[in-house]
């Protein structure tokens, strides 16, 4: 159990999101980086849909109210327990009364704090994912008490995990959308040849892409009938400005979509920090299905990426959790 001492103001509970409510205008939401949920679940031996705390900006400061076990995944943050460093992509025991501090993300946008048993959060439309802009859930605030959904007494070894490679990506794969044909072959070629930069006007709803040169327009761009949209769609505004839609995107949109990023590449582009660059490549639906199948198999065996950590005793904040035996041994030649 944890108490929030300080936070960036944009941290919220997230799971794998809500499905089946798009027709009612309810966004999917869910973690921007679903790989991080699977990694945290593997470290804590629990369901990947367990609710985690998604951290945006400075992670925050937390008081440990009761002994618990946590895992840290996603974009790497400087982490410490009572001012002693904690390793990232790892699980840790926290003793009651200690202070957990998490800094600013270093190699991405979204970091995740997982609690053994999952965080307790209200289920709204079959999900604990918060979307405060839609009146669903809230951001965490100082003095909030973060409790486990389940209290799991059995001991579990601390582990580390080799994260899925997604933080150095410079390209994303996409498939044609229902509206790709509205763009001329010349415009599509220009799009895939262009290097885009991540703009600072980006959030959980979408990423604004900037580039040099004119926009990417279609004929009758502002007269297209609104249609269903999903995370991964790349919309072009009236000025031809591209936006990549993410977890909190709306359910309907009228801007034309030049393509849709395949799900396995969405965490990578979501994690790109402001100023990073990216290019896009169209692939066939058959290839996209093969990649998705490989991704599912990778996640099914993700626990195989877990290892017992090699740790420096001088830097172990949880050293007292281990039995250290001292004594003498007599041996006869």
Task: Name each region found by the language model.
Residues 1-333:
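Conserved "landmark" site that anchors the functional core of diverse proteins
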């Amino acid at each position: 159990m944890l108490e929030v001492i300080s936070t960036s103001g944009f941290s919220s509970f997230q799971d794998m999101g809500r499905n089946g409510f798009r027709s009612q205008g309810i966004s999917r939401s869910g973690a921007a980086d679903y790989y991080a949920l699977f990694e945290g679940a593997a470290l804590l031996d629990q369901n990947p849909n367990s609710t985690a705390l998604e951290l945006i900006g400075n992670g925050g400061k937390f008081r440990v109210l009761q002994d618990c076990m946590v895992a840290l995944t996603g974009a790497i943050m400087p982490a410490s327990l009572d001012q002693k460093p904690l390793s990232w992509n790892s699980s840790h025991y926290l003793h009651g009364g200690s202070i957990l501090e998490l800094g600013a993300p270093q190699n991405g946008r979204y970091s995740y704090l997982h609690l053994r048993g999952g965080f307790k959060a209200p289920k709204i439309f079959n999900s604990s994912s918060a979307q405060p802009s839609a009146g669903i859930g809230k951001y965490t605030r100082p003095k909030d008490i973060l409790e486990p959904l389940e209290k799991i007494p059995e001991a579990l070894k601390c582990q580390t995990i080799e994260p899925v490679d997604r933080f150095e990506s410079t390209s994303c794969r996409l498939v044609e959308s229902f509206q790709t044909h509205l763009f001329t072959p010349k415009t599509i070629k220009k799009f895939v040849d262009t290097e885009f930069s991540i703009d600072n006007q980006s959030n959980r709803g979408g990423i604004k892409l900037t580039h040099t040169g004119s926009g990417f327009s279609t004929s009758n761009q502002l007269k297209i009938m609104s249609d269903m949209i999903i995370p991964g769609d790349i919309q072009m505004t009236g000025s031809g400005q591209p936006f990549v839609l993410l977890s909190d995107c709306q359910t309907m949109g009228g801007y034309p979509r030049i393509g849709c990023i395949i799900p396995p590449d969405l965490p990578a582009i979501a994690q790109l920090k402001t100023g990073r660059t990216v290019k896009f490549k169209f692939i066939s639906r058959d290839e996209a299905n093969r990649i998705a199948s490989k991704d599912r198999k990778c996640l099914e065996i993700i626990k195989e990426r877990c290892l017992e950590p090699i740790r420096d005793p001088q830097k172990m904040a949880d050293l007292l959790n281990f039995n250290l035996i001292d004594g003498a041994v007599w041996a006869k030649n």
